[in-house]
Structures are given as structure tokens and as C-alpha cells.
């Protein structure tokens, strides 16, 4: 018992180190925090017996609570969250204009300042955050209009609730599929998930909660549960667009029942997006997505290999203008092939989804660390590990 206590204290110390003291540019300090964190995480997973499972799940929740009041030093996305939230609260649609528009035309709402504008990491593109996130931004900045840090705490509160829900749902789904209960620790104690979701305010955590909730209700044969599942799936898509890639697998499994399911998702998404829809929305949102596939390059895998080969052979430097979209098409058709090839069963669905998101991550031009939170969550129901 005392060993558990010591390890839990070390977990807490490493969480505090990564959440409160390390800055984004301090690479060695980040590695110094993550390396022992992951080693202990693996040790706990391998050694944990059933009797200690609830203790470690509680530790996972506690570590997230520790990060509730930290400022997200490892990510500067919070400034765009706050920017969008204030725009909504002052009657502006965040999808209408680039941030520079408000500076150039001197129409900044009172709480938005040139100083905040200079902190944005995304001045050159329109916002890409779907309506569920925009609502959270608006509520958080409405509660604390004068404080970025306090608005961040409010956003983290939503994520914390989602993470607690995800841990519970993972436990229920593992029990339902008669899988090892300690697999829940693969998500609950994962250092990357803890630090990037609750610590650095990345809403993959909320997307995962809604996706797990949709899956939990979907495996029921009750029509009411299927309605709830469709609404939860809409919430997941309206948090991050990524779960759209999972829908074709449901068509194969549900067959004619998918018509009603997809209709509910479509209506729910229309209602969620309705407050933001206007003549500019599709053009501006599409422009940002196009920019993502054509211009952004970070931690890519297949893209970097093909780019290097192209540059060696053709000695031209505009490869990213077409290679990114080309890989997106490759990913699309690979996922469709996966839908056709994989057997349709609720038990096999998480593995199919895991393969699909793995194909996406292999082909995309940008892979931030927090993108791995989704495959980590899905892998707990499979024999594969991230």
C-alpha cells in the first residue's frame, strides 16, 4: 500500500512540474518530466491488480484536478479560444473575418486588445473551432471577461467533467465487452492525455467523451438509446470534425437503421451550427481547412518522406500545394477500403476506428502530440497500443 502512495506522490510531482513550471521551448525539461512519468505509468499498468484499480483511477482524476488552475504553458491556443469567445459575446461571428480585420478597421470589442492579437498563433487564418467549442469559449469568457487565466480555468472545468465521464464510460465498455478492467488505466493515467487535455486545454478530450457516450448508447438495442447515441455523435463531431471518418463504419453495421441514425445526427448538427451559419461561413471555414492541408507541416510522417523524394527527383519546392490534398484523398479511399474489408460488429468497431484514425495520422501533414489522445482512448478496447 505504501508503494502505491509513493508512486502517486511522484505522479503528482511530475504533473505539477509539467503543468506549472515547464515552458513550451524547454525541450529537455519536458522530456525530463515525461520520461519518468511514462515509465511509472507503464509500471503501474503492468503491476496493478484488480483490488488497486479504483485507487489508480482515482489518482488519474486527481492528477487532472491538480492541473485545473495551471496556465497552459505548453500551448498558446488559449489566446484564440479567448479571442473567439469575446467576439461571440459582443455579437460578432468568429467565422466572418480574420483577426486582423478587427485591428485594421478599428472595431475591436473593448476586451479584445492589440496585445491579445499579438499573442495569437493563427492570425492568418479563420477560426476552425466547431460550435460546441465556440459555446464553451463564449461561456468561459462571459464568466471571466477580464482574465485569460480564469477563462482558461472555466474551459478546463468542462474538460475535467468530460474526462471523468470518459474514464467511467471506458470502464463500463470494458466490462460490457469482457475486456481486462485495468485497460482503463491506459487512458486514465496516460501522461500525454492528462497534460495535453486538462493541462493545455485541448478539446480532443471532449470529443472523446461524446464519442464514447455515442458508442455506449449505440450498442443498446433500445431505440431511445440510439437517439441519444446520435445526439452524442453530433456533439463529438461538433467538438472536432474528426469523428466524421467513423460514420461509414456505422452504415455497414446498422444497415437500414442507419438512415434514422444519420438523420438525427444531421438535424442535430444543423441546429448546432445554425447560429454560426451565414454567407461567409462555408467559404471561410473551407479556406482554413484548405490551408491546413496545403500549408501546415508539423511532425508529419509519410508526407515528409514523399516530400523529400519529390524534391530530390524534381528539385521543385511547391510540392506541399498538392501533396497534402493528395494524401487526404489517399486516406479517404484507404478508410473506405477498411470499411469494406473489416467485419461489422460492435466488438470490432473500436479496432476499425483505431485503424481509420491511424491512417489519417499517417497521411496528414500535421500531427500535434494531443492528436494521439483519440487513438489512445480507442486502443484500450483493442489488442493494439499507442
Predicted features and spans:
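Start-transfer (signal-anchor) and selected internal transmembrane alpha helices
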Residues: 1-67, 71, 175, 345-351
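Transmembrane-helix motifs of polytopic, lipid-linked glycan transferases
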Residues: 39-46, 139, 153-177, 333-341
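Transmembrane-helix signature of polytopic, membrane-embedded enzymes
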Residues: 50-51, 55, 167-191, 346
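Intramembrane catalytic core of multi-pass membrane enzymes that act on lipidic substrates
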Residues: 50-156
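Hydrophobic alpha-helical membrane-interfacial segments at the cytosolic entry of transmembrane helices
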Residues: 56-63, 255-277
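Specific aromatic-rich, kink-prone transmembrane helix
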Residues: 165-169, 206-221, 357
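Aromatic/glycine/proline-enriched transmembrane-helix motif characteristic
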Residues: 167, 295-366
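Membrane-interface alpha helices of multi-pass inner-membrane proteins
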Residues: 194-197, 213-217, 225-251, 355-362
Amino acid at each position: 500500500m505504501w508503494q502505491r502512495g509513493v508512486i502517486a506522490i511522484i505522479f503528482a510531482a511530475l504533473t505539477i512540474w509539467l503543468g506549472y513550471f515547464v515552458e513550451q521551448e524547454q525541450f529537455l525539461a519536458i522530456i525530463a518530466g515525461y520520461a519518468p512519468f511514462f515509465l511509472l505509468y507503464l509500471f503501474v499498468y503492468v503491476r496493478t491488480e484488480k483490488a488497486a484499480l479504483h485507487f489508480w483511477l482515482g489518482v488519474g482524476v486527481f492528477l487532472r484536478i491538480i492541473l485545473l488552475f495551471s496556465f497552459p504553458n505548453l500551448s498558446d491556443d488559449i489566446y484564440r479560444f479567448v479571442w473567439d469567445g469575446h467576439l461571440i459575446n459582443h455579437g460578432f461571428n468568429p467565422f466572418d473575418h480574420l483577426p486582423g480585420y478587427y485591428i485594421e478597421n478599428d472595431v475591436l470589442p473593448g476586451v479584445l486588445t492589440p496585445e491579445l492579437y499579438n499573442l495569437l498563433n493563427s492570425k492568418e487564418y479563420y477560426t476552425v473551432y466547431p460550435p460546441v467549442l465556440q459555446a464553451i469559449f463564449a461561456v468561459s469568457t462571459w464568466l471571466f471577461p477580464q482574465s485569460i487565466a480564469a477563462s482558461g480555468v472555466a474551459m478546463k472545468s468542462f474538460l475535467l467533467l468530460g474526462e471523468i465521464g470518459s474514464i467511467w464510460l471506458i470502464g463500463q465498455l470494458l466490462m460490457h465487452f469482457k475486456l481486462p478492467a485495468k485497460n482503463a488505466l491506459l487512458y486514465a493515467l496516460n501522461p500525454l492525455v492528462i497534460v495535453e487535455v486538462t493541462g493545455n486545454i485541448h478539446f480532443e478530450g471532449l470529443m472523446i467523451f461524446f464519442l464514447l457516450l455515442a458508442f455506449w448508447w449505440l450498442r443498446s438495442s433500445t431505440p431511445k438509446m440510439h437517439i441519444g447515441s446520435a445526439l452524442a455523435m453530433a456533439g463529438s463531431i461538433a467538438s472536432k470534425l474528426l469523428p466524421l471518418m467513423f460514420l461509414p463504419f456505422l452504415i455497414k453495421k446498422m444497415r437500414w437503421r442507419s438512415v434514422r441514425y444519420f438523420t438525427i445526427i444531421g438535424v442535430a448538427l444543423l441546429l448546432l451550427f445554425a447560429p454560426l451559419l451565414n454567407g461567409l461561413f462555408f467559404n471561410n471555414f473551407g479556406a482554413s481547412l484548405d490551408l491546413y492541408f496545403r500549408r501546415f507541416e508539423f511532425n508529419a510522417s509519410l508526407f515528409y518522406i514523399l516530400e523529400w523524394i519529390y524534391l530530390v527527383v524534381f528539385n521543385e519546392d511547391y510540392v506541399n500545394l498538392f501533396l497534402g490534398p493528395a494524401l487526404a484523398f489517399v486516406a479517404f479511399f484507404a478508410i473506405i477500403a477498411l470499411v469494406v474489408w473489416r467485419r461489422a460488429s460492435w466488438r470490432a468497431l473500436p479496432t476499425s476506428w483505431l485503424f481509420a484514425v491511424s491512417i489519417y495520422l499517417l497521411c496528414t501533414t500535421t500531427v500535434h502530440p494531443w492528436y494521439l489522445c483519440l487513438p489512445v482512448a480507442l486502443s484500450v478496447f483493442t489488442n493494439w497500443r499507442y
